[in-house]
Regions:
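Alpha-helical membrane-interface segments at transmembrane helix boundaries
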Residues: 6-13, 91-105, 138-146
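Hydrophobic alpha-helical transmembrane segments of polytopic membrane proteins
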Residues: 144-160
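Alpha-helical transmembrane segments
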Residues: 22-32, 111-114, 118-121, 155, ...
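Predominantly long cytosolic amphipathic alpha-helical stalk/bundle segments
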Residues: 39-133, 160-191
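Transmembrane alpha-helix/interfacial motif
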Residues: 8-50
Length: 191
């Protein structure tokens, strides 16, 4: 296994290795963003869920660590505009990192394809300089396709992570929206 990796490294085009290194950096970054945001959103959703539960059990106001509490403290009256501002700010905060995952999901296959094209061009150049047997062609194309496979691999994770975080963000926004509606109905302003 290690010998195969060393052979691949020694025989591959520099651009292909650069593409694989770039995709590795992409993969590390998207995993960091995903796990950081996932655990942050989980913690946030738990706080909002507890605050909503307290409201539904008769509490007059949201919990002090609930997102809307910051907006409620700044105003003497509860109104829809104040809560709309809070909802917008919460949605913006909850969706942080999604654009990075989206960019990685859409660009990773193209980066891999770029490495493949350059590697295939290098293979054709080597075929022109030597007697091109089928073994030389197959080996060159095989090495070239590794970059595309790596790009698709990274994109699959980025897209999956994007969808998971998008759903978690929607959950947090929904919990905040329910708190807003409960507060407005208690104050007589309606939702």
């Amino acid at each position: 296994m290690v010998d195969s990796l060393i052979d691949f490294y020694l025989q591959s085009n520099g651009v292909t290795l650069f593409v694989l290194a770039l995709l590795a950096v992409y993969f590390i970054a998207l995993n960091w963003v995903f796990y950081y945001r996932y655990f942050s959103l989980n913690s946030w959703a738990s706080k909002e869920s507890d605050s909503l539960e307290a409201l539904l059990m008769g509490s007059a106001n949201v919990a002090s660590d609930a997102y809307l509490s910051h907006f409620i403290k700044t105003s003497s009256t509860l109104n829809k505009e104040l809560f709309d501002l809070g909802m917008y700010a919460a949605t913006k905060e909850a969706t942080k990192g999604l654009s990075l995952l989206s960019v990685v999901a859409s660009t990773a296959p193209f980066i891999g394809l770029f490495g493949t094209v350059v590697s295939i061009l290098d293979t054709f150049d080597n075929i022109g300089g030597a007697s091109g047997t089928m073994n030389i062609i197959a080996a060159g194309v095989s090495d070239a396709l590794i970059a595309t496979a790596a790009g698709i691999f990274v994109a699959i994770f980025a897209y999956t992570y994007h969808q998971i975080l998008k759903r978690k963000s929607f959950e947090v926004s929904g919990l905040i929206r329910m708190q807003r509606d409960a507060l407005l109905s208690k104050s007589g302003h309606g939702a």
